[in-house]
């Protein structure tokens, strides 16, 4: 998997630089998301991992994508096909998203709670995380009944566990030691 990261990095950087230069970051992210989804199709994955000529591979892939790809994106796919790298498109997408977040000074923050949070609670969490991280945050909320009460906040490798479950686990650890 780390090989995919290494292989995908220059493609993601090239796509991102092109998208920024042409003010088409949203469009390129959508195109990359679509192509990444196409590579997850079993039949396409078999085609891409088989011994097919790069030209045939790129033509077939572009035909499957149809109108979703503009001319520069088709050229991007051709280059990746020539180098046998179409299977790394999902990783290219992930790195493209990271580059975009870095450019926009945003960070994705996952907020897990036992029940839905109201707008006021979300605003307070967003403000606190923006202050702590010195960046804009994009909250991704999910319901997790195992949290019991409170919230668990994840941003990158940072975890803030304000859940009742987390408190009970920490209390149990203290009592056992």
From Swiss-Prot:
<keyword id="KW-0139">CF(1)</keyword>
<dbReference type="GO" id="GO:0046933">
    <property type="term" value="F:proton-transporting ATP synthase activity, rotational mechanism"/>
</dbReference>
<comment type="function">
    <text>This protein is part of the stalk that links CF(0) to CF(1). It either transmits conformational changes from CF(0) to CF(1) or is implicated in proton conduction.</text>
</comment>
<keyword id="KW-0066">ATP synthesis</keyword>
<comment type="similarity">
    <text>Belongs to the ATPase delta chain family.</text>
</comment>
<dbReference type="InterPro" id="IPR026015">
    <property type="entry name" value="ATP_synth_OSCP/delta_N_sf"/>
</dbReference>
<keyword id="KW-0406">Ion transport</keyword>
<dbReference type="Pfam" id="PF00213">
    <property type="entry name" value="OSCP"/>
</dbReference>
<dbReference type="InterPro" id="IPR000711">
    <property type="entry name" value="ATPase_OSCP/dsu"/>
</dbReference>
<dbReference type="GO" id="GO:0045259">
    <property type="term" value="C:proton-transporting ATP synthase complex"/>
</dbReference>
<keyword id="KW-1003">Cell membrane</keyword>
<keyword id="KW-0997">Cell inner membrane</keyword>
<keyword id="KW-0472">Membrane</keyword>
<keyword id="KW-0813">Transport</keyword>
<dbReference type="GO" id="GO:0005886">
    <property type="term" value="C:plasma membrane"/>
</dbReference>
<keyword id="KW-0375">Hydrogen ion transport</keyword>
<dbReference type="InterPro" id="IPR020781">
    <property type="entry name" value="ATPase_OSCP/d_CS"/>
</dbReference>
<comment type="subunit">
    <text>F-type ATPases have 2 components, F(1) - the catalytic core - and F(0) - the membrane proton channel. F(1) has five subunits: alpha(3), beta(3), gamma(1), delta(1), epsilon(1). F(0) has three main subunits: a(1), b(2) and c(10-14). The alpha and beta chains form an alternating ring which encloses part of the gamma chain. F(1) is attached to F(0) by a central stalk formed by the gamma and epsilon chains, while a peripheral stalk is formed by the delta and b chains.</text>
</comment>
<protein>
    <recommendedName>
        <fullName>ATP synthase subunit delta</fullName>
    </recommendedName>
</protein>
<comment type="function">
    <text>F(1)F(0) ATP synthase produces ATP from ADP in the presence of a proton or sodium gradient. F-type ATPases consist of two structural domains, F(1) containing the extramembraneous catalytic core and F(0) containing the membrane proton channel, linked together by a central stalk and a peripheral stalk. During catalysis, ATP synthesis in the catalytic domain of F(1) is coupled via a rotary mechanism of the central stalk subunits to proton translocation.</text>
</comment>
């Amino acid at each position: 998997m780390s090989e995919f990261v290494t292989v995908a990095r220059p493609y993601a950087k090239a796509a991102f630089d092109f998208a920024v230069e042409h003010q088409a970051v949203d469009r390129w992210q959508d195109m990359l998301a679509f192509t990444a989804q196409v590579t997850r199709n079993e039949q396409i994955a078999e085609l891409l991992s088989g011994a097919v000529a790069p030209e045939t591979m790129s033509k077939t892939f572009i035909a499957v994508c149809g109108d979703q790809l503009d001319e520069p994106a088709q050229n991007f796919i051709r280059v990746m096909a020539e180098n046998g790298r179409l299977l790394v498109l999902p990783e290219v997408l992930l790195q493209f998203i990271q580059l975009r977040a870095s450019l926009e000074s945003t960070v994705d923050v996952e907020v897990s709670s036992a029940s839905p949070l109201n707008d006021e609670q979300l605003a307070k969490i967003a403000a606190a995380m923006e202050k702590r991280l010195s960046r804009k945050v994009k909250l991704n909320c999910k319901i997790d009944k195992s949290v019991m009460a409170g919230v668990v906040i994840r941003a990158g490798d940072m975890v803030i566990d304000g859940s009742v479950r987390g408190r009970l686990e920490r209390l149990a650890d203290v009592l056992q030691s």
